[in-house]
Each structure stands twice: as C-alpha cells, then as structure tokens.
C-alpha cells in the first residue's frame, strides 16, 4: 500500500511494563477461531493499567519479536523470560480491523515511521496556536493527536440473539459504572465498546451519580437498541482535570482545557486565603466576643454604675471593707450574709412524695 495510506492509518500501541510486587497485572488468553493471543483482564492500579494496556487488546509483539503465530505457552515463556520489564505491541479491536482492511502489517516500526515525519509538527502547531485560531478546534485537534483521542465515544448497538454482549460492573474504589468485559463478535464489540470504559450517558440521559440498578434499568428501557456514551480511562482522567462532565457535544465540538499550573496555584491560593479567612477570625472572634461581653456587662452595669460609684454605703456595708464598725458587728454581718445564701429549708412533710417520685 502507499505511504500516504499508511500515514493516515490508525496506529498500534507500545506498552512498556515494569513488573510490580504482584507481577504485571494482566491476563492473557487465546480465543477459539481467532489467531493470536489477547488481553483478557487488566487489574486496576497494576503496571499493565498504568502502561495503557486494555482488555480486548491483541498482542502482536513481545520485546520487538512478532508472536502472532506462536502458541499461548510460547508467548507466556517470552514474557517470563523478560525478567522485570517487558515491551508489548498491541492493537485494540477497532484499530486491528482497520489495519487489516488497509492491508497494513502491524509492527513496531510503524510507530517509528509515524514519529519521524511528525517532528516538525509541534513547532507549526505552536505557531497556529499563537495565531489564536480559536474558531477551528478540529484543526487544533489534528495538530494534537493525543488530544483528538481524548473524546467520549457514542456506541450504538442493537440487541442480538444473546443480548448486547457486555458485562456491567461497579468498582468500590472508583465512582461510576464500568464495562467489565465485551464478548467477541457481539453487538457491543461491533459498536466499539471496550472493557474498562465508563458509562456517562444511556440513550442521552446522564448517568453520573446513578446506582448500578439505575443504569441497568435505563439500558433495558431502550428496548432492542441502546446508545451508550462512554469514556476510556485516559479520557475520563482528562475531563476530570478539566472539571467538566463529558457529553455528546464533545464528540466533535471543542474540547475543554485542563487547569494549568498557574490556575491551580490561583485556586490553591484562593483556597488558602479562604481557609485563612475562615480560621483567622477565630481568635479575633474570641476577642470581639469577650469585648462584646464586657461591653454588655458595662452597659448593664452603667445604670448601676451610679449605684456602684454613688453608694459608698454599699461598700461600707461590707464587713471586711468597713473599718469603722466593731469586730462583733462585723462578725454578725458576716453571719447574716452566710445565712442569707443558704438554701431554703426543705418541707419534710413532702419527703415521702419526693422520694417516691425518684
């Protein structure tokens, strides 16, 4: 085929994995009637997931060696022989189908061939951005292929004899409903649905914050046909950084922009100021509260202030402060003061009633 056709073809993915404490974190299997080995399951948080490996990917090369015609055990032996790191060239079902139609052989050199002519593109893309051509988001997407991929996907499928052909599940560590697996040759696979996709909308209705049963009911309510707006892991992270919920407007329209470091710092500074504002008044509030209290006490005492200043008689009535009276008189007044503070005597005629109530 021509070089131009190859240049426009979708590309495989090169996933570089470093073995963790529990291995690489993916399951390999072969399918009946299909040649090759496939990724069946990718464990969350594993080196395989971090490297971008997806369930349903077909394994083409291991450390630069083609394994398309090798048996399951031969491929496993190659991976184990790599010790603590391995390089896997894979293709997802959609890319695999398109490359087969174009007659392109999947190999690692295909990625290098695409990188070489594109080295001058970043500078041209920077100039285009500097020119401020904001009215052509699709052109900006073309100069940023990684951003062009970070779009939601609308998967339209009609129910087959065995249903749609996918399993739905929820993850305790992550909010939302996810595609656990997609059956080969199913309506779900034909629509482009992939394992680990997160469902955003069902038949145009947003499923954010919905429970598992709600999503299942919405799918069943569509009858024999359903439309699922989904995002893969990378796209989901991109929209979360932008603080935007994906929608059908993002299928072809302009994409949101993630917060830059400056904006994040501004947000952090605003949060810090807000925290400082919420925390700093606390001591001042204590002081103002005490001053308010003292003012209230003074205002209450201000009318009696005249009493407290005028009646030196009240101060002279204090047995301790009055030095003009005799000691016996002072003792008598002190005794009267103590007796006036005593609790009233109990009516013992009611003691039985009181105790019985207790």
UniProtKB/Swiss-Prot annotation:
SMART domains, per database record: PDZ (SM00228)
Record PTM Phosphoserine, positions in chain: 2, 46, 162, 269, 280, 290-291, 294, 299, 302
Main location: cytoplasm
Keywords noted in UniProt: Acetylation, Cell membrane, Cell projection, Cytoplasm, Membrane, Phosphoprotein, Repeat, Wnt signaling pathway
Membrane topology: Peripheral membrane protein
InterPro entries linked: EBP50_C, NHER, NHERF-1/NHERF-2, PDZ, PDZ_sf
Comp. bias (Polar residues): 287-306
Biased composition (Basic and acidic residues): 135-149, 348-358
List of residues that carry Phosphothreonine: 293
Subcellular location: Cytoplasm; Apical cell membrane; Endomembrane system; Cell projection, Filopodium
Xref: Gene3D superfamilies: 2.30.42.10
Protein's UniProt keywords contain Acetylation: yes
Biased segments, Low complexity type: 114-134, 307-319
GO biological process, any: negative regulation of phosphatidylinositol 3-kinase/protein kinase B signal transduction
Residue span, PDZ domain: 14-94, 154-234
Gene Ontology terms, MF aspect: chloride channel regulator activity; protein-membrane adaptor activity; signaling receptor binding
UniProt entry tagged with the keyword Cell membrane: yes
Residue ranges, annotated region (Disordered): 114-192, 269-358
Subunit structure: Homodimer, and heterodimer with NHERF2. Binds the N-termini of EZR, RDX and MSN. Binds the C-termini of PDGFRA, PDGFRB, ADRB2, NOS2 and CFTR. Binds ARHGAP17, EPI64, RACK1, OPRK1, GNAQ, CTNNB1 and PLCB3. Binds PDZK1. Interacts with CLCN3. Binds the C-terminus of PAG1. In resting T-cells, part of a PAG1-NHERF1-MSN complex which is disrupted upon TCR activation. Forms a complex with CFTR and SLC4A7. Forms a complex with SLC4A7 and ATP6V1B1. Interacts with TRPC4 (via the PDZ-binding domain). Directly interacts with HTR4.
Protein name: Na(+)/H(+) exchange regulatory cofactor NHE-RF1
Organism: Macaca fascicularis
Gene: NHERF1
């Amino acid at each position: 085929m021509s070089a131009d056709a190859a240049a426009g073809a979708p590309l495989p993915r090169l996933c570089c994995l470093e073995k963790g404490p529990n291995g690489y974190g993916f399951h390999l299997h072969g399918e009946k009637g299909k040649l090759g080995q496939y990724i069946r399951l990718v464990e969350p948080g594993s080196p395989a997931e971090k490297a971008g490996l997806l369930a349903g990917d077909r394994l083409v090369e291991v450390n630069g060696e083609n394994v398309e015609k090798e048996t399951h055990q031969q491929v496993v032996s190659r991976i184990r022989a790599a010790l603590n790191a391995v390089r896997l060239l894979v293709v997802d079902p959609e890319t695999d189908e398109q490359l087969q139609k174009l007659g392109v052989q999947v190999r690692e050199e295909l990625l290098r061939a695409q990188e070489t002519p594109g080295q001058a593109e970043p500078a041209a893309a920077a100039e285009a951005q500097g020119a401020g051509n904001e009215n052509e988001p699709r052109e900006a997407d073309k100069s940023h292929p990684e951003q062009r991929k970070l779009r939601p996907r609308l998967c339209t499928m009609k129910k087959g004899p065995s249903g749609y052909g996918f399993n739905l599940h929820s993850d305790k560590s992550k909010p939302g409903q996810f595609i656990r697996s997609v059956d080969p040759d199913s309506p779900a696979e034909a629509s482009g649905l992939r394992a680990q996709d997160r469902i955003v909308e069902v038949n145009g209705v947003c499923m954010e914050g919905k429970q598992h049963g709600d999503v299942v009911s919405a799918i069943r309510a569509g009858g024999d046909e359903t439309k699922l707006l989904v995002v893969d892991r990378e796209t989901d992270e991109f929209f979360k950084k932008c603080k935007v919920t994906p929608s059908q407007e993002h299928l072809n329209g302009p994409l949101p922009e993630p917060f830059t470091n400056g904006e994040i710092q501004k947000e952090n500074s605003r949060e810090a100021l807000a925290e400082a504002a919420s925390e700093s008044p606390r001591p001042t509030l204590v002081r103002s509260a005490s001053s308010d209290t003292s003012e209230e006490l003074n205002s209450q005492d201000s009318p009696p202030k005249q009493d407290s200043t005028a009646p030196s008689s009240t101060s002279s009535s204090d047995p301790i402060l009055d030095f003009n009276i005799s000691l016996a008189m002072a003792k008598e007044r002190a005794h009267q003061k103590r007796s006036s503070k005593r609790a009233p005597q109990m009516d013992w005629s009611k003691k039985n009633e009181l105790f019985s109530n207790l």
